[in-house]
Each structure stands twice: as C-alpha cells, then as structure tokens.
Amino acid sequence: MMTTNKMKGLKFAKKSIAQIRRPAVWLWGFNPLRRISKPGIASFSNLMPSTGLNLNVMSFNIRRGTAKDGKNHWKFRRNRICELLNHYHPDVLGLQEALNFQISEIRTMLPGYENACAENVSGIKVLHNSIFFNASRFCLSEQGTFWFSDTPDIPGSKGWGNIMPRTCTWARLIEKNSRQAFYFYNVHLDHLSRRSRKNSVVFLTQFIHKRSSPDPFVLTGDFNAGEKSAPIKYLKGKIPLKIRKKGFVSNPEPLMDTFRVRYPNDRHVATFHGYRRLFFRFRPDYIFVPASVRVQDAKIIHPLWRKYYPSDHFPLLTHIGLPVISASANFSAFSKDEQPALSAAP
C-alpha cells in the first residue's frame, strides 16, 4: 500500500522498488532501498563494494527565472525547487538554465553546498550550468567553463548556429576522506540548431578525453536531443558523426545512460513536460558515465507541489559507484601541503 506524506506542502509517495512496476513515474518516490540513512541518500552497505566512491548525482533543468509563466513563475517555483533539493540532498547537482539571481537564491536556501559556475559576462544574459556539491564531503580542485563555438575560451561566444551562448561548466572534486578525485561536466545544448548539437558533443567528448588526469567522470545536462538522435547515439559510441573539415569522428570514451542501464525497456522516460499533465514524450535530459562506473540505481522524479511542478523539466537522480584510482594517479590533485605520503613500492 502506498503511504503519502506531506513536507511543507510537498507531496511524495514511499514505495520500494519491488512494489513498483514503473519505477520512473511516481511522485516524490525516490526510495530505492528500504533503509534510508539520510533523506534522499540510500545506504549502500549491502549493495556496493567497500572500495570506490559512491555518489548520489542529480541533473535538473530549473527553467530560466525571467520566463513569464504565470502560476509557474520563478517566484512561485523557487521554494518548490529548494524543498526538492533539500529532500533528496544529492552529493553533486548539475543545474541547467539558471540565471545569476536563481543561483544566488538557491545557494542561500541550500545550506552546506558550494557551487562552481561560469563568470558573469558583461552585457550578455547567460543561462548557467551550475554545479553544486556537498561541501562537507568534497572540496573543489579545479573548475572551468567553455563556450560551444569555434572560440571556446572567449566568454559569451556563439557558433555553429547557436542563437544564444551555450556552455559546459566542469569541476574536479576531491572527496575529503578518501582523497579520491573525479570530474563533473554539466551542459545545456542548443534547442534549435542540429549542427550545433553535433559539433558540441564532438567538442565535449574530445575535451573530456584530454582531461589532465585519469579520474573517472560524470556528465549531466539538457542535451535537447532524444534517445534516438545522432548526438545521443554518438555519446554512447554507437555511431560516428560527420563534422565539417574533420570527417567522421567517434567518441573516444563511449558513455552509458545511467537510466537505461537500470531500465533498458522502460517507455515512461519523458523528462520535459512544459507544465502539462499530458506532457510530451520527449527526453532531452541525461546523466552519462563511462563503462568503468557502476550504476546502482537511477530515477526520473515526478514531483508535484499542490498540483504544480517545480520546473518544466523533471529532475534525474542516480546512484553510482566510481572505480578506485591509485594513489599515484590521484597525487596531482593536491597541493604540496595536502599531498598524502605515498608508500614505497615493495
């Protein structure tokens, strides 16, 4: 039997995975395990290996705060979003389509988190892809933002048919206890230009492949592309893409869609609804990981707040286990004062 609880106006259902036929479509029901040690964070004691780094990752397009959405305007949605985030309390969160004032308000209402974000560009309205992380567990080693264009290092630059600047914000995070590092990339691709989406995923995967250390990584974002589209197939390593002046290009590190790893045949996968109950069957949002990462669970959350949604997209949540990286591989993550002593080889 489903039991319903209320938390400051939030409505969510509690069910175990075994009780749910369609695990992607219940309200506030992310409860993959029966034992919960912290709201929104599952205990991995019986399911995950004792080694490696276990993470709870969320991706969420929160809709730009200046949109004239009536009862779904940001001033009404702000509390819904913050209650959702505080309820699930992800280790790392990738937000898309966030304006500066939205990031500032979320930072205030989300205690214990720090964020990595692109710098402001004078005279340009930038929809940020901000990365929030649990500051009690992680510290920020590196961060950056590049712009999907022929001049990716120039803030505000556009290209390939983008009607507005499109970015990727990335961060290298270090877990304080294990001192294990990983990269986190967060993107929002153009919604109109197919050429832009193709060029963007090729540039993105080449950028990831050239990262300065062999740490594992997570990729989140709104790709504005369905599961059968060429950019998504490219990311999964299923097809190459033909790029001008480059010919056919393949993804050097094929990725897994964390939701499809767990639910390969589920049909209820839409993540964009446009505030409609009978929403479009379109899924532009993903959390990707390389094959070395273990996917423990994944969900598309369908939250309601007094008959209203927090955003025009549904958030995604996944539980993953990152592989162990040797101490020598992680050594470069720290300053000289922070570097742990490496044991001599036998």
Residue ranges and their predicted role:
Residues 69-73, 158, 194-198:
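Short, solvent-exposed loop/turn segments at secondary-structure boundaries
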Residues 16-17, 21-49, 92-185, 189, ...:
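Structured beta-strand-rich core segments of catalytic domains in phosphoester-bond hydrolases
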Residues 56-62, 81-106, 132, 171, ...:
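Active-site beta-strand/loop signature of hydrolases that rely on acidic residues for catalysis
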Residues 6-47, 137, 195, 206-217, ...:
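Metal-dependent phosphoester-hydrolase catalytic domains
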Residues 74-76, 109-112, 201-203, 234-238, ...:
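Glycine-rich, phosphate-binding/catalytic loops in enzymes
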Residues 65-68, 101-104, 123-128, 141, ...:
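Short catalytic/ligand-binding loop motif for oxyanion handling, primarily in non-cytosolic enzymes
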